[in-house]
């Protein structure tokens, strides 16, 4: 298997899909990353944990419809060209 631009894009799509399907109550809450976790005090920089939680929520919110479209295109391309 050659390392091509298509395989790189497919790997990125799989990673974004993995982030998008993380369920907050089933998975994130079990590892201590639920919504009830404190973000920090006033004037403090948010930590890595809160920034990752914000990234996960943003990906799940913003990328829902584009992921459906890109996944559909990827499936059609795989069916047509193997």
UniProtKB/Swiss-Prot annotation:
Q: Which UniProt keywords apply?
A: Endoplasmic reticulum, Membrane, Protein transport, Transmembrane, Transmembrane helix, Transport
For this protein, the parts annotated as crossing the membrane are: 2-22, 62-82
Residue spans making up a coiled coil are: none
Q: Does the keyword Signal apply?
A: no
Q: Name one GO biological process term.
A: positive regulation of protein secretion
Q: Does the keyword Endoplasmic reticulum apply?
A: yes
How the protein sits in the membrane?
Multi-pass membrane protein
The record ties this protein, via InterPro entries, to: Yos1
**Localization (cell):** Endoplasmic reticulum membrane
- Give the Pfam families listed for this entry: Yos1
Instruction: List the GO cellular component terms.
Output: endoplasmic reticulum membrane
| Task performed by this protein | Regulator of endoplasmic reticulum secretion that acts as a key determinant of brain size. Required for secretion of extracellular matrix proteins. Required for correct brain development by depositing sufficient extracellular matrix proteins for tissue integrity and the proliferation of neural progenitors. Acts as a regulator of the unfolded protein response (UPR).
The family assignment reads:
Belongs to the YOS1 family.
Q: What is this protein called?
A: Immediate early response 3-interacting protein 1
Q: What organism does this protein naturally occur in?
A: Rattus norvegicus (Rat)
Question: What lineage does the source organism belong to?
Answer: Eukaryota, Metazoa, Chordata, Craniata, Vertebrata
């Amino acid at each position: 298997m050659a390392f091509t631009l298509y395989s790189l894009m497919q790997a990125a799509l799989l990673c974004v899909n993995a982030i998008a399907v993380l369920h907050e109550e089933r998975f994130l809450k079990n590892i201590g990353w639920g919504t009830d976790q404190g973000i920090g005090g006033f004037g403090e920089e948010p930590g890595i944990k809160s920034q990752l939680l914000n990234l996960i929520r943003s990906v799940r919110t913003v990328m829902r419809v584009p992921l459906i479209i890109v996944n559909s295109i990827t499936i059609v391309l795989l069916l047509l060209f193997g």
